[in-house]
């Protein structure tokens, strides 16, 4: 039986790529990749698809943004000498960071208003 080595290399590359994606899914995830995948499939139109690597990428972005906001809110609560993060701390953290302020334009319930001094 003749075996083409290029085909075997392609298959082994695809298997190793799948294993890498799988390892990323397993290691320390804050959000469940399967749940994000299901929600993306429900929201994407019928003519397009959602790949496994797309879901892992989206999940990592969500984890990064969540971690960033929570770290800033934690710093705000520590500055105010409070142990619990409230919506007000989230509001102050997001509005205090220029990039997050442009990214998150929505209203945070219970966040009150940021004072604007002329």
From Swiss-Prot:
Post-translational modification: Not ubiquitinated.
Pfam families: Histone
Keywords: Chromosome, DNA-binding, Nucleosome core, Nucleus
Cellular component per GO, a single term: nucleosome
Tissue specificity comment: Not detected by RT-PCR, but promoter weakly active at the margins of leaves and in the root apical and elongation zones.
Cell compartments where the protein resides: Nucleus; Chromosome
GO-annotated molecular function: DNA binding; protein heterodimerization activity; structural constituent of chromatin
Gene3D superfamilies: Histone, subunit A
Keyword Transferase: no
Function according to Swiss-Prot or TrEMBL: Core component of nucleosome. Nucleosomes wrap and compact DNA into chromatin, limiting DNA accessibility to the cellular machineries which require DNA as a template. Histones thereby play a central role in transcription regulation, DNA repair, DNA replication and chromosomal stability. DNA accessibility is regulated via a complex set of post-translational modifications of histones, also called histone code, and nucleosome remodeling.
PANTHER family in UniProt: HISTONE H2A
Family: Belongs to the histone H2A family.
Subunit structure: The nucleosome is a histone octamer containing two molecules each of H2A, H2B, H3 and H4 assembled in one H3-H4 heterotetramer and two H2A-H2B heterodimers. The octamer wraps approximately 147 bp of DNA.
Identification of the protein by name: Histone H2A.8
Source organism (scientific name): Arabidopsis thaliana
């Amino acid at each position: 039986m003749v075996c083409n080595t290029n085909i075997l290399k392609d298959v082994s590359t695809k298997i190793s790529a799948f294993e890498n994606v799988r390892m990323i899914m397993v290691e320390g995830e804050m959000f469940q990749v399967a749940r994000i995948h299901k929600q993306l499939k429900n929201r994407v139109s019928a003519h397009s698809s959602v790949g496994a690597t797309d879901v892992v990428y989206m999940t990592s972005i969500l984890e990064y943004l969540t971690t960033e906001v929570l770290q800033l809110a934690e710093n705000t609560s520590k500055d105010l000498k409070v142990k619990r993060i409230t919506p007000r701390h989230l509001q102050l953290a997001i509005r205090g960071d220029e990039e997050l302020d442009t990214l998150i334009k929505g209203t945070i319930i219970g966040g009150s208003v940021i004072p604007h001094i002329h």
